[in-house]
Amino acid sequence: MQLNSTEISELIKQRIAQFSVVSEAHNEGTIVSVSDGVIRIHGLADCMQGEMISLPGNRYAIALNLERDSVGAVVMGPYADLAEGMKVKCTGRILEVPVGRGLLGRVVNTLGAPIDGKGPVDNDGFSPIEVIAPGVIERQSVDQPVQTGYKSVDAMIPIGRGQRELIIGDRQTGKTAMAIDAIINQRDSGIKCVYVAIGQKASTISNVVRKLEEHGALSNTIVVVATASESAALQYLAPYAGCAMGEYFRDRGEDALIVYDDLSKQAVAYRQVSLLLRRPPGREAFPGDVFYLHSRLLERASRVNAEYVENFTKGEVKGKTGSLTALPIIETQAGDVSAFVPTNVISITDGQIFLETNLFNSGIRPAVNPGISVSRVGGAAQTKIIKKLSGGIRTALAQYRELAAFSQFASDLDEATRKQLSHGQKVTELLKQKQYAPMSVAQQGLVLFAAERGYLEDVELAKIGSFEAALLAYVDRDHAPLMQEINQSGGYNDEIEGKLKSILDSFKATQSW
């Protein structure tokens, strides 16, 4: 069979017409150096700040330094087998984490991958870890309380939904214990919780998860973990990942609480990453943008108005405000609150709870120092009964501290001073509270009423604890409907005052403590 030239040319034309070229443009680069989890890449021309870079072995790095002829990136995961000359690609995506209700009750790492052995996470979608905080017009004032269950905090340093309240103190002063108790107290309040553990031992985190499970709070909580053995990059990014998971609830008209434990370790991890990227160091060798590191994170904790929620959900949720309340933790060295990172976070947050080593060691737990602890916006959110009855507590403690220092030098004290000292000691004793024993609004109100109206005057100092326990057992047994009513309404009027007075009068008559 012979083909003539015309047929050959027709055949070639057909083949050319049918030929399709599918070309994909890849922004590809080459690793030029690897050191301590930081890689320098040559050739990524169109790389974005914060973009995920695909590495060999199904791993990713995040671009943090964009220079004229190279890109500095931190590896998210193991980096020991990465070598000079390996090819990497841009993905065109910013780092995202899974979000949704399916994460509640789960323990995940910084990237949202489950590490609790309970199978894959059932997420509702993905959210970028870096999001711009809601603007001024989209916010609403803080006027609803977050009950921590601690008498000393709810009475003197109240926290509102959408507030940022710093918990600050030296190591071993009960910072994590206070945050965990606040999470446990939300199990029936409808507030979803996120606990972010940064740079802690795996055994410590395991203990926290077990305690949350024991007290029925894990099903309402997402635990985000970046242990001390993980890379500095994962420790630095963990709070942003946790915040994105908390914002899921805020943006849908719900309330959420997030605990960052602790931001001192995050700042150290960020310092490590920055120094490896050869960024110029500043005070205490921290980079110049360490304030921005924390401010852009904590500004995302807010209370947003109903219009914002409606626009975000495209009209699915109407007439509901959302909130994300933050409890960042900062560890100080020898009580030095004037160090760089503590002063930064104090200036960003809406108040601080200062826990003191001396108080903790003398048995006053929670070791709250009422003198320098403050809540700048929580007063407007305080429950009515607590607000009415806690007014004299702070004053009594302030006067007691002043007189206690003075009385050490004075040999004879007048009757009024002795009375003030005695009252201050009893109030201090009354504010002590065991761990994992949060109190309801009604229980706190009753105890504060007893302190405020002088029912403790004839009770011995050593018996204040047993007096309180017996009183709470008495009302739970004989006056449960009233306690339920106060818990539901949080109100305080002449009728409730009269009922509380008659309860305390009848209890005092029994002398059963």
Swiss-Prot record:
Subcellular locations according to the entry: Cell inner membrane
Catalytic activity: ATP + H2O + 4 H(+)(in) = ADP + phosphate + 5 H(+)(out)
InterPro entries from the UniProt entry: ATP_synth_asu-like_sf, ATP_synth_asu_C, ATP_synth_asu_C_sf, ATP_synth_F1_a_nt-bd_dom, ATP_synth_F1_asu, ATPase_a/bsu_AS, ATPase_F1/V1/A1_a/bsu_N, ATPase_F1/V1/A1_a/bsu_N_sf
Domain of life: Bacteria
Chief localisation class: membrane
Enzyme class, broadest EC rank: translocase
Annotated Gene3D superfamilies: 2.40.30.20, ATP synthase alpha/beta chain, C-terminal domain, P-loop containing nucleotide triphosphate hydrolases
MF GO annotations: ADP binding; ATP binding; proton-transporting ATP synthase activity, rotational mechanism
Protein residues bound to ATP: G169, D170, R171, Q172, T173, G174, K175, T176
Gene Ontology cellular component list: plasma membrane; proton-transporting ATP synthase complex
Keywords: ATP synthesis, ATP-binding, Cell inner membrane, Cell membrane, CF(1), Hydrogen ion transport, Ion transport, Membrane, Nucleotide-binding, Translocase, Transport
Bilayer topology: Peripheral membrane protein
EC numbers for this chain: 7.1.2.2
Site entry: Required for activity: S373
Pfam entry (one): ATP-synt_ab
Family: Belongs to the ATPase alpha/beta chains family.
Described function: Produces ATP from ADP in the presence of a proton gradient across the membrane. The alpha chain is a regulatory subunit.
Subunit (UniProt): F-type ATPases have 2 components, CF(1) - the catalytic core - and CF(0) - the membrane proton channel. CF(1) has five subunits: alpha(3), beta(3), gamma(1), delta(1), epsilon(1). CF(0) has three main subunits: a(1), b(2) and c(9-12). The alpha and beta chains form an alternating ring which encloses part of the gamma chain. CF(1) is attached to CF(0) by a central stalk formed by the gamma and epsilon chains, while a peripheral stalk is formed by the delta and b chains.
Name listed for the protein in its UniProt record: ATP synthase subunit alpha
Record organism: Enterobacter sp. (strain 638)
